[in-house]
Amino acid sequence: MNTLQKGFTLIELMIVIAIVGILAAVALPAYQDYTARAQVSEAILLAEGQKSAVTEYYLNNGKWPENNDKAGVASASDIKGKYVKSVTVEKGVVTATMLSSGVNKEIQGKKLSLWAKRENGSVKWFCGQPVQRADAGAAN
């Protein structure tokens, strides 16, 4: 009598395991990049919340606010998120500082700044690595 065997051979199982390993190796870096972007977007969102107050202060006073209090926003330690330690306003530059733990290792403790320049009668905002303005009265 001939018996019919059902199931996978060892070779077939090894091939499936190899394919799953390759897919995981490709997906993991993409996932880590995605989580870092999501964490940085929180920093941008919290920093952007201060732009209108900084702009209004500049337009009313002709100089950039020296700190959070002058800008009329909450203190730096009160503006925080799940991944953001604090958001400071210093001479009109809004800087978000990432936490040193619990975030993607590439952005731990890093800072992101938003700063404005007066151009043709309007205020134009920029985003990038931390900057410092030498004088609060400077137009740029």
Region annotations inferred by a language model:
Residues T3, T9, T35, T55, ...:
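Residue-identity detector for threonine
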Residues D33-S75:
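Conserved hydrophobic/amphipathic alpha-helical signal-anchor segments
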Residues Q5, L28-Y31, V54-T55, K80, ...:
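Generic intrinsically disordered, low-complexity segments enriched for polar/acidic and small residues
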Residues L59-N140:
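Periplasmic/extracellular, small/polar-rich flexible segments of pilin-like filament-forming proteins
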